[in-house]
Amino acid sequence: MKPVKPPRINGRVPVLSAQEAVNYIPDEATLCVLGAGGGILEATTLITALADKYKQTQTPRNLSIISPTGLGDRADRGISPLAQEGLVKWALCGHWGQSPRISELAEQNKIIAYNYPQGVLTQTLRAAAAHQPGIISDIGIGTFVDPRQQGGKLNEVTKEDLIKLVEFDNKEYLYYKAIAPDIAFIRATTCDSEGYATFEDEVMYLDALVIAQAVHNNGGIVIMQVQKMVKKATLHPKSVRIPGYLVDIVVVDPDQTQLYGGAPVNRFISGDFTLDDSTKLSLPLNQRKLVARRALFEMRKGAVGNVGVGIADGIGLVAREEGCADDFILTVETGPIGGITSQGIAFGANVNTRAILDMTSQFDFYHGGGLDVCYLSFAEVDQHGNVGVHKFNGKIMGTGGFIDISATSKKIIFCGTLTAGSLKTEITDGKLNIVQEGRVKKFIRELPEITFSGKIALERGLDVRYITERAVFTLKEDGLHLIEIAPGVDLQKDILDKMDFTPAISPELKLMDERLFIDAAMGFVLPEAAH
């Protein structure tokens, strides 16, 4: 049963309170929620109204949730307020860890739970807008979304196959089913009286248009939260990202903020202001900076790269310190191109950004092999070079864009520490000192579920490195090869004994560059790209 839309009067989009708007969501509806971490483009007022309504009335019931990007604060925001038994029965997310209350329902087998790669999920929404049954892609082959493995299912109660293995011209692909949503929660900054919307105070666009088209073309209701409204036809047409005919309900929240907390708008993050070179931004010399510095050594002039959330995200600041940040382009999967990468939950809220694409188009570029290099954080690595990030220690985190990015990037740099859990290190006198070893080994014999396939990467001719604070590995046909160790660490005690398998030791094993361990600019010169 399709939801019933409120009527327009004289072409004006209905303007309702959030409480009135969520009354249009029927039982069993499929709700698609726009937003990214830290409050980026999150329609918080709508989410809160829906959560409160269910607490009070126990309606609507049995919703299905689609969330392409990880929105939330890794605690109680994002879609975590919707984690109420009976409100949600099914979820398909690109990333889960930013809204852990929803993840907990999946971990407890209380909801049906799927994970598509983030880029694939936004592309299936575009397919749903075009009334296409799904997409066919080689992204995800050899990983847990491959139906020969887990097929993207995250728990025991999830049974239906949404992903199928298909073959064309003797090549394997995955078919990802497109799910058409009935309701959309989207957000913009401003709209006119007919619903035409602009994003001038927002950090990015994400896939707002794709979601709105998917819901509209399948007879659903698009509910849009904005900070303000203006008169009809007063917005610049080149600034409008959502045409009014896609919008069925507008909810105005004058207290809407760009991110969680803080000022309503940070003009550096919205792209209106830029930081000049006199503004000093730097990282303290610790294991995080050490990894970012070593990762920078893998960059080349003119390269186009991606940087992921986590320990890898310091590379932009390190490059700025070294004076080479303008010699390459770093992108973020949510749309930003260039600039200084943010850190923490509001990942992608960059400053000095050069351009911003919609997220779906950014992933098209990635899937087609456009990236020269990517920097991704890892949770676990096994002896075959496989990497796991989507599920570990019993917790569902989801893949985000990890699979999309690592599947085709020409060079793949995984960044992390060798161990986890209370690891403490010091960098003194040009050496690394392990003050307190981590409790958990991250290099294990076999991964239970695979987010990155070393085997597939080698078949595709990709160059794969694993950079930690004390060791650097590369991937070859026979597995991991140790190629560098940090000065001050013992090969056996601090590296090999802290792994569940023994890597091959390169005959050219050397110390990591001594400049990495000095608390001063390295004088690093970015190498030219090989031709």
Regions found by a protein language model. Name each.
Residues P26:
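Helix-to-beta-strand junctions that scaffold the AdoMet/dcAdoMet cofactor pocket
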Residues L31-V33, V304-G308:
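Short glycine-rich phosphate-binding loop at a beta-alpha junction
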Residues L50-L63, F328:
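Beta-solenoid repeat scaffold
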Residues Y196, T274-Q287, R294-N306, G479-L480, ...:
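Glycine-rich phosphate/diphosphate-binding loops and the adjacent beta-loop-alpha structural elements
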Residues V22, R61, L281-P284, R293-R300, ...:
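Glycine-rich phosphate/ribose-binding loops and adjacent secondary-structure elements
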Residues T30-G35, S64-S67:
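Short glycine-rich or small-residue beta-strand-to-loop segments that form or flank ligand, phosphate
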Residues K2-K5, I9-N23, G38-Y54, I66, ...:
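Conserved phosphate- and dinucleotide-binding cores of soluble alpha/beta proteins
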